[in-house]
Design a protein with these regions (language model features):
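Flexible glycine-rich surface loops and low-complexity tracts that mediate binding to linear polymers
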Residues: 138, 142-144, 187-201
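Short nucleic-acid-contacting surface segments enriched for D/E, G, S/T with interspersed K/R
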Residues: 176-192
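Coil-to-beta-strand transition motifs
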Residues: 4-6, 137, 165, 189
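OB-fold (S1/OB) nucleic-acid-binding surfaces
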Residues: 150-175
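Flexible, glycine/threonine-enriched loop-and-boundary segments that flank and lead into catalytic domains
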Residues: 116-154
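Sliding clamp-binding short linear motifs
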Residues: 1-131, 195-197, 206-207
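Short beta-strand segments
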Residues: 140, 166-170, 203
């Protein structure tokens, strides 16, 4: 992300907007590392640049600015490479990079790319699991949104997971938590087998 002062610089100099990463670097006075972070976060889409193309352009322009002797001789363009068309980044990789930089993605959900494999293994979407009949045993998987271990819950852990279809609420008993503690407490994606428990119109999957 950006520091507060970096964001203020960017906003103060934007005027009618920025046309290229170079104009952003020049007008806002942002450093190359800051522009690289913006490129990695796919922030240059409005300029018609993909994440990979933006990184390439930022690094190339920054390198060009470090040759004052050539610039003074009017030779700044000498030795520069011809335009390169970069291959598109696979959509799954784009989504992963979105999560690494912004903790979310508007392109797709990471679990979408596992759906075909999960279907073959009998792992159902969270929405289907949450709507299953009371007492049914299910297998589902999702990205961890929330972990809670209230002091009054006698060691029980409550976890909310999410996939591209919705969310499911998990109840993890102490014996299960102790058996799988590193996974339960730290994993970003959880696969769970449990029994559906519905009471007062609230559904949990009890692991």
């Amino acid at each position: 992300g950006l520091r507060q002062d970096e964001m203020e610089q960017l906003m103060a100099a934007r005027g009618a907007g920025y046309e290229t990463p170079e104009s952003l670097m020049r007008r806002a006075g942002l450093s190359r590392p800051v522009l690289e972070r913006l490129a990695a976060a796919d922030a240059f889409g409005s300029m018609g640049l993909s994440r990979r193309s933006a990184l390439w352009k930022v690094r190339g322009e920054a390198a060009g600015r470090t040759l004052p002797l050539f610039a003074a001789a009017g030779l700044a363009g000498q030795g520069s490479e011809a335009g390169v068309t970069l291959p598109l980044i696979p959509r799954s990789e784009e989504v992963i990079q979105d999560y690494q930089t912004a903790r979310l993605s508007l392109k797709d959900h990471p679990m979408h790319f596992l759906r075909e494999v999960h279907a073959r293994r009998g792992i159902i979407p969270t929405r289907e699991a949450a709507q299953s009949r009371n007492g049914r045993r299910v297998r589902t998987s999702g990205l961890v949104l929330v972990r809670q271990q209230p002091g009054t819950a006698s060691g029980v852990v409550f976890i909310t997971i999410e996939d591209e279809t919705g969310i499911a609420n998990l109840v993890v008993w102490p014996r299960v938590k102790e058996r799988f503690r590193p996974v339960i407490m730290r994993a970003r994606i959880l696969h769970v087998r449990g029994r559906v428990q519905t009471a007062d119109n609230v559904t949990h999957i009890v692991a």
